């Protein structure tokens, strides 16, 4: 039997630092990094104008991503997915992917306060002006209304982190 890679994915509110952390983790683990933002921008340029558009197009790429990730894991390579696991349904999708692939997983929960996330979103707007229309406090509150913190009964391998962007990685097992 061949050795499967490990899948890493993230749970955290908008602005928690999932993309920043995922890049660092992929580099540290020498893993393949897949970014939902990059996939959506490549496949649906200029078509995502609202949160509803995001939900629609995100759902469209999932089947392709799932097969790609399973194929990469089958080679023994680790995969870091910069895709949100912010709801029970999203986390179930990741767990199902892992079950089908026969691989281990680790979910990093970036447990930041709303205030910390909003501060990082404000900084991101300055650094990436093209995101200013979407990276607003109003969108943060709209998206956060759907956020569901993970629970023990989900059977996830969770590492909780208080990573705050450039402040560094603080992990609580």
Predicted features along the sequence, with ranges:
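Conserved GTP-binding G-domain of TRAFAC-class P-loop NTPases and closely related GTPase folds
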Residues: 24, 115-173
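Conserved substrate/cofactor phosphate-moiety recognition/catalytic segment
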Residues: 20-77
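Hydrophobic anchor at the beta1->P-loop junction of P-loop NTPases
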Residues: 10
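Conserved glycine(s) of the Walker
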Residues: 17
């Amino acid at each position: 039997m061949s050795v499967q890679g490990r899948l890493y994915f993230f749970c955290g509110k908008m602005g928690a630092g999932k993309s920043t952390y995922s890049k660092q983790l992929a580099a540290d683990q020498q893993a393949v990094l897949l970014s939902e933002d990059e996939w959506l921008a490549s496949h649906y340029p200029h078509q995502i104008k609202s949160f509803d558009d995001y939900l629609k197009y995100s759902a469209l790429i999932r089947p392709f991503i799932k097969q790609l990730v399973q194929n990469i894991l089958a080679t023994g390579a680790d995969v870091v997915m910069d895709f949100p696991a912010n709801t029970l349904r999203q986390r179930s999708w990741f767990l199902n992917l892992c079950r089908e692939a026969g691989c281990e997983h680790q979910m990093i929960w970036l447990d930041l306060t709303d205030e910390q996330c909003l501060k990082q979103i404000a900084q991101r707007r300055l650094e990436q002006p093209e995101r200013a229309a979407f990276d607003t406090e109003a969108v943060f509150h709209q998206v956060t209304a759907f956020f569901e913190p993970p629970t023990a009964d989900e059977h996830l391998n969770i590492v909780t982190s208080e990573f705050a962007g450039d402040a560094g990685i603080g992990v609580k097992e």
